[in-house]
């Protein structure tokens, strides 16, 4: 998952070929017992054999932190805390043209559609997700890469679309799931959207908040059929998930029946609240408050160049 998520992060840039991507791996472990040593070895083996070799990408650089354990004495007791085995992947590549990079922000164009590309094989696994942590559920099944060939086909198809300027915006699904991905693009673009989910989804919360592999792309309606066909021809699941609206609101519908409505400004402030509280303590409190007050305001231009 770490490797594929890193690749999805830079897939919006004109890279053309997967082997052009190189990875940096940061390995972290306490590495003080046979169990952790075995798990670390199996992780490295799986990354190389099951993922990198099949994708044709390399890991030329990286670092390791293999002493992730703290021990101390307290009330005549020996106490220790250690990090679980953790791998952080960063991806990098040269690109053909910076102007072809597709941004993670929706364009305010009503003649467009937002398409969800699902790379999970229809799974809603929520183990380790923000949803499971907030609700304190004991979901043991975590997202994983089910079909590496499908992932390769997705990369190739998406690079073709970028090369031919057929995608207006792009954002990968990650922390917070599909709903957060859609909201972040709306916040960045300052546009409201109508999100339409199917009524036959068995668990709407898991569908919205699972953190499986996937992306959303915004496409001109003139090219919508062509874009969807390219993905479908590569056996990649895709469907229209949202449309731009002119109300500056986020509306969630279940096949046209509205189940949730909120102003974009209110949701943007909620999304930014944690960062704001930290910023108040860390930086100038008055400046932090001034910034927070204009978050999501439709009339705020933000940083711009007056030509």
Regions from the language model: what does each represent?
Residues 15, 41-43, 58, 64-209, ...:
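Intein/HINT protein-splicing elements and their conserved insertion hotspots or analogous self-processing inserts
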Residues 212-214:
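Short, solvent-exposed beta-strand edge segments and adjacent coil->beta transition regions
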């Amino acid at each position: 998952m770490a490797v594929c998520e890193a690749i999805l992060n830079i897939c919006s840039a004109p890279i053309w070929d997967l082997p052009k991507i190189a990875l940096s791996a940061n390995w972290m472990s306490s590495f003080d017992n046979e169990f952790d040593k075995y798990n670390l070895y199996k992780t490295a083996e799986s990354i190389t054999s099951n993922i990198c070799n099949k994708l044709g990408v390399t890991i030329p650089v990286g670092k390791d932190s293999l002493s992730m354990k703290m021990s101390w004495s307290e009330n005549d007791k020996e106490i220790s805390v250690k990090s679980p085995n953790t791998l952080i992947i960063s991806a990098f590549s040269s690109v053909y043209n910076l102007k072809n990079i597709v941004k993670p922000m929706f364009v305010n164009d009503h003649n467009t559609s937002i398409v969800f590309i699902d790379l999970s094989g229809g799974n809603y696994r929520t183990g380790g997700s923000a949803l499971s942590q907030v609700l304190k559920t004991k979901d043991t099944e975590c997202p994983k890469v089910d079909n590496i060939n499908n992932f390769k086909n997705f990369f190739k198809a998406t690079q073709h679309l970028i090369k031919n300027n057929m995608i207006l915006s792009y954002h990968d699904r990650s922390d917070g799931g599909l709903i957060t991905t859609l909201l972040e693009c709306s916040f960045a673009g300052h546009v409201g959207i109508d999100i339409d989910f199917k009524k036959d989804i068995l668990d709407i919360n898991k569908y919205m908040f699972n953190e499986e592999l996937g992306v959303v792309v915004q496409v001109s309606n003139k090219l919508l059929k062509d874009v969807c066909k390219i993905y479908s021809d590569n056996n990649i699941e895709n469907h229209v998930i949202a449309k731009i609206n002119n109300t500056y609101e986020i509306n969630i519908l279940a096949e046209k029946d509205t189940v949730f409505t909120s102003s974009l400004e209110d949701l943007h402030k909620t999304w930014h609240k944690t960062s704001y509280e930290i910023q108040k303590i860390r930086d100038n409190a008055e400046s932090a408050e001034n910034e927070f007050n204009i978050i999501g305001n439709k009339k705020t231009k933000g940083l711009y160049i007056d030509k």
